Amino acid sequence: MTMCSGARLALLVYGIIMHSSVYCSPAAAGLRFPGIRPEDEAYDEDGNPLQDFYDSDPPGVGGPASTLRDAYALYYPAEERDVAHGILNKAYRKVLDQLSARKYLQTLMAKSVGGNLDGGAEDDSEPLSKRHSDGIFTDSYSRYRKQMAVKKYLAAVLGKRYKQRVKNKGRRIAYL
């Protein structure tokens, strides 16, 4: 369980980092902060950035998806992406293996406890609860029967002892 939660936590942290770095970065979203100016941009006298006509595509050629893809490729080279995807795939496979193993063990336990080999999904919970309540009743009843047998035995033994004492007129005889 600890390993599974650790893998889930690693997967969650990795997903949050990748999401925030790709989709929430100012360059990918096209946001500009007025107090922060990149040093390689040119500005006019009003402080507005000048458009770079040599590096940019004409308007309408590239959509937002291509811009996002270009920004992703710029910030994360292919080698780093492959390593990150490999780590993610390894952690994801480990989590899936643990989940499938847990599910397999649960089905084995349900079959061994329930004795149901045809694997009906709706019949799994009913026999287990019925068997559980039957077991509780049987256990309580057998405990009650044992207590009654002990009381009956003690009453018989102590009754005989009392009768023997009366018969022997006070002489003590050890019976137990």
Curated annotation (Swiss-Prot):
Q: Where are the annotated coiled coils located?
A: none
GO annotations of cellular component type: extracellular region; neuron projection; perikaryon
Q: Which GO terms describe its molecular function?
A: neuropeptide hormone activity; peptide hormone receptor binding; pituitary adenylate cyclase activating polypeptide activity; type 1 vasoactive intestinal polypeptide receptor binding; type 2 vasoactive intestinal polypeptide receptor binding
In terms of one coarse class, where is the protein primarily found?
A: secreted
> What is a biological process (GO) this protein takes part in?
positive regulation of transcription by RNA polymerase II
The segment annotated Important for receptor binding runs over 150-158
Chain residues in the propeptide:
25-80, 173-176
Which keywords belong to this entry? Answer: Amidation, Cleavage on pair of basic residues, Hormone, Neurogenesis, Secreted, Signal
Q: What superkingdom does the record give?
A: Eukaryota
Record bears the keyword rRNA processing: no
- Sequence positions bearing Leucine amide: L158
Q: Where in the cell is it found?
A: Secreted
- Signal sequence range: 1-24
- Keyword Signal on this protein? yes
At what positions is Lysine amide found?
A: K169
InterPro entries associated with the record: Glucagon_GIP_secretin_VIP (IPR000532), VIP/GHRH-like (IPR046963)
Q: Which family does it belong to?
A: Belongs to the glucagon family.
Outline what the protein does.
PACAP is a neuropeptide involved in diverse array of physiological processes through activating the PACAP subfamily of class B1 G protein-coupled receptors: VIP receptor 1 (VIPR1), VIP receptor 2 (VIPR2), and PACAP type I receptor (ADCYAP1R1). Exerts neuroprotective and general cytoprotective effects due to anti-apoptotic, anti-inflammatory, and antioxidant actions. Promotes neuron projection development through the RAPGEF2/Rap1/B-Raf/ERK pathway. In chromaffin cells, induces long-lasting increase of intracellular calcium concentrations and neuroendocrine secretion.
| Protein name as catalogued | Pituitary adenylate cyclase-activating polypeptide
Q: What is the lineage of its organism?
A: Eukaryota, Metazoa, Chordata, Craniata, Vertebrata
Give the gene name.
ADCYAP1
